Regions:
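Oxidoreductase cofactor-interface core, primarily capturing Rossmann-like NAD(P)-dependent enzymes
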Residues: 2-38, 55-61, 65, 76-86, ...
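Rossmann-fold cofactor-recognition segment
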Residues: 43-56
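A short hydrophobic/small-residue beta-strand
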Residues: 49, 99-100
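Redox-cofactor binding/interface segments in oxidoreductases and associated redox assembly factors
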Residues: 52, 69-73, 102
């Protein structure tokens, strides 16, 4: 039996591998990757590489083995994920894996925003497959905001259409730790975890925190969804993705990313990373 992680060279995947290496012998860890060269650092740490491309299902035939515990990290190509995930689920079923854990989105089948559609479809694919599953319904990453600090600092404004909605975010490392815990621990089969930070915050509070830490005046500027979408497209985002992001903001305004179930802290055995900690780390890197 091996612990297998797909998307192992991505931002979340690399952190999951780090977590696994802290508790599991490297020889029991497998990284499924598209590009062997990109994964050279993982191989150097003793992680087995299995090369496969989600867009070419035939390459997935050797990605999994009977008894493997598999972490399916959701793909990053919005619009292609259902087909890609379907190929992985089929390959995992054919191999007879012991567990398929999937990183979905907060709310699962009840999530009512565009970004959730592919995640909901993937969860249904997994349920229909009959595979032993664990659903990791990830909330918002704090890094979704802190990765875009440059324009915020330049213009002195956090621009969004999220109203007074609150966001129970956590760091990417928190979600990685939970994923590692689920594929290395027991008692998680058939479970769906609603993962989010311990504390929800508003964008006005986020702007106030940025002001406090930087010493600059930064405000939350609420704009209509259509205007926000125009701003995002003007900044270079594809129109479809900009529409998804403004739709997420509307979901935030409705309270869809504010839930604090405590599942994330329980799985990791520690409090989630505070917003201020991630903000300070990001500012130090700007």
């Amino acid at each position: 039996m091996s612990i297998v992680a797909t998307g192992a060279t991505g931002e979340l995947g690399r952190l999951v591998i780090d977590e696994l290496l802290a508790t599991v012998p490297a020889g029991e860890i497998v990284a499924v990757v598209r590009n062997k060269e990109k994964a050279a650092a993982l191989a150097a740490r003793g992680v087995e590489l299995r090369i496969a491309d989600y867009d070419h299902p035939e390459t997935l035939a050797e990605a999994f083995r009977a008894g493997d515990r598999v972490l399916l990290i959701s793909g990053s190509e919005v619009g292609k994920r259902v087909a890609q995930h379907s190929a992985i689920v089929e390959a995992a079923k054919a191999a007879g894996v012991a567990q398929l854990a999937y990183t979905g989105i907060l709310g699962g089948p009840d999530a009512d925003f565009l970004l959730a559609d592919e995640h909901k479809a993937t969860e249904q694919l997994i349920l229909d497959s009959g595979l032993p599953y664990t659903f990791l319904r990830n909330g918002w990453y704090t890094e979704n905001y802190t990765a875009n600090l440059a324009p915020v600092l330049e213009h002195g404004a956090v621009v969004a259409n999220a109203g007074e909605g609150r966001i129970a975010s956590a760091s990417r490392a928190d979600y990685a730790a939970a994923a590692a815990a689920v594929v290395t621990g027991e008692g998680h089969l058939g479970k769906a975890y609603e993962l989010s930070g311990d504390t929800a915050w508003s964008l006005a509070e986020y702007a106030a925190l940025l002001s406090e830490v930087t010493g600059k005046e930064i405000t939350y500027k609420e704009v209509p969804a259509a205007a926000h979408q125009e701003i995002l497209v003007g900044a270079g985002l594809p129109e479809g993705f900009a529409a998804i992001l403004t739709d997420v903001d509307e979901a935030i305004a409705r309270g869809r990313l504010a839930g604090t179930s405590g599942d994330l802290a329980r799985l990791t055995g520690r409090p989630t990373t505070p917003l201020a900690t991630t903000v300070r780390a990001a500012l130090a890197a700007v």
